[in-house]
């Protein structure tokens, strides 16, 4: 019990902050309301250092827990800075004009509380050692995001996206929960380590295999992988850009961590020389990875909305990351570049940073009527009209492409080397072809942002003071 409590300090810090922001967000004093995001900042910093100093565990992947929590806290802090000022902007403008603050109209407290609840669930996912714990952690990660999508913008499109997101999320939860039930029926336990021991001793029964396959398909919704990807472009476009950035990282990270734990029960010791998942699972993931990266990249070519391009790009990145899952951890004590799970975790970090940077630029560009920049013409020439935002956008987009020597190149290189080391040459060829396809729409975004067209629009975009967002929110 003491050991379990020691590794849960990051979650405890976040939960305490969640309780506090629900109070401060509704406080009549504006100074206290503006302090709300800073409570989250302190909690995330404490969670980061708590994860850094947490003791080693005896779980399935003992090195994953502290590293994953540090990544979650760091990227969560970046997302928090982006989320600040997303809600209650008009309410604060009305207060400046002398109107009385009405807490019943304010969403600030709930908005930050839902964000912190989601991050708490994500960290609990990384700490999971039981199927019931894993299910509850995944749902705690996902449920707040449905509400955040709905409240992020005062438009019908946000509500429509939230409803679609919720019902598909409920369907996926039912699928992977049924898979968990089959796994329990096949092994008689919900403890992940005990499940792995049963599978190792007695083999994987047909019921256990069916349970694993259903769990994988259900969790694929979290990572926006084919065939559970349909909601992604509509939800990303309907939500405010900061919330879209959160959706691109938080549920995806939870899904991949859950996949690592679930597939770790079966192990990668199959095949003539080991290093492979059971054939039905590996074949399912192989097809899913190839289709996900191909569908995402091809459909991104057809879009004129920047957020829809980034949504399909997010789908494609899930396909890339599945290569790390398929490759597995490699030989015990083997080099880093052969460890697919290590490459996956590093890629999640790089992807989180790149995604937040890209959506931060979109969140900082608004039309005169207050609507966010979204159409590809809205970013035309921003390298010249708004140099800091423009070049930030260019660098993050090139990094998502994997352009050397940027961070995204290093992350993608790890997936390539791990896949080659595991012998999945055909999948690596598909990954290379898809990277070339992705270059078409990524370079299109770069070219448009650099080209200066004085006749571009009768409704130009204006840069908002992004560095003041934390004080505004």
PLM ranges: what are they?
Residues 1-473:
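Alpha-helical transmembrane segments of multi-pass membrane proteins predominantly involved
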């Amino acid at each position: 019990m003491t050991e379990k409590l020691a590794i849960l300090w990051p979650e405890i810090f976040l939960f305490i902050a969640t309780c506090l922001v629900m109070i401060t967000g509704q406080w009549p004093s504006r100074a206290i309301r503006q302090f709300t995001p800073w409570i989250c900042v302190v909690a995330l910093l404490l969670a980061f250092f708590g994860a850094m100093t947490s003791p080693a565990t005896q779980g399935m992947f003992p090195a994953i827990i502290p590293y994953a929590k540090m990544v979650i806290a760091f990227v969560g802090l970046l997302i928090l800075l982006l989320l600040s000022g997303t809600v209650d902007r008009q309410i604060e403008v009305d207060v400046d004009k002398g109107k009385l603050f009405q807490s019943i109209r304010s969403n600030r407290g709930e908005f930050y509380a839902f964000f912190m609840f989601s991050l708490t669930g994500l960290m609990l996912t990384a700490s999971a050692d039981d199927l019931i714990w894993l299910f509850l952690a995944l749902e705690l990660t996902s449920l707040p995001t449905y509400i955040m999508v709905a409240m992020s913008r005062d438009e019908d499109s946000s509500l429509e996206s939230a409803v679609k997101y919720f019902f598909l999320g409920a369907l996926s939860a039912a699928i992977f929960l049924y898979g968990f039930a089959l796994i329990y029926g096949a092994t008689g336990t919900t403890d992940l380590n005990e499940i792995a021991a049963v599978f190792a001793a007695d083999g994987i029964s047909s019921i256990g295999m069916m349970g694993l396959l259903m769990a994988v398909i259900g969790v694929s919704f979290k990572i926006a992988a084919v065939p559970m990807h349909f909601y992604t472009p509509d939800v990303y476009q309907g939500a405010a850009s900061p919330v879209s950035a959160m959706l691109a990282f938080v549920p995806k990270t939870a899904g991949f961590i859950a996949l690592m734990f679930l597939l770790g029960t079966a192990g990668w010791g199959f095949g003539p020389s080991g290093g492979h998942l059971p054939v039905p699972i590996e074949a399912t993931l192989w097809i899913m990875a190839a289709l996900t990266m191909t569908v995402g990249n091809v459909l991104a070519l057809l879009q004129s909305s920047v957020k829809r391009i980034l949504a399909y790009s997010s789908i494609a990145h899930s396909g890339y990351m599945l290569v790390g899952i398929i490759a597995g951890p490699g030989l015990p004590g083997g080099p880093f570049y052969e460890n697919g799970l290590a490459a996956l975790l590093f890629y999640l970090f790089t992807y989180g940073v790149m995604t937040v940077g890209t959506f931060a630029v979109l969140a900082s560009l608004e039309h005169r009527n207050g609507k966010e920049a979204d159409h590809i013409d809205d970013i035309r020439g921003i390298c010249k009209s708004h140099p800091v935002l423009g070049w930030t956008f260019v660098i993050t987009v090139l990094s998502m492409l994997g352009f050397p020597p940027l961070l995204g190149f290093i992350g993608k290189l790890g997936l390539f080397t791990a896949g080659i080391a595991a012998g999945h040459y055909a999948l690596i060829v598909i990954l290379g072809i898809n990277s070339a396809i992705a270059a078409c729409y990524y370079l299109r975004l770069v070219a448009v942002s650099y080209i200066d067209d004085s006749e571009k629009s009768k409704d130009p975009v204006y840069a908002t003071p992004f560095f003041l967002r934390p004080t505004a929110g």
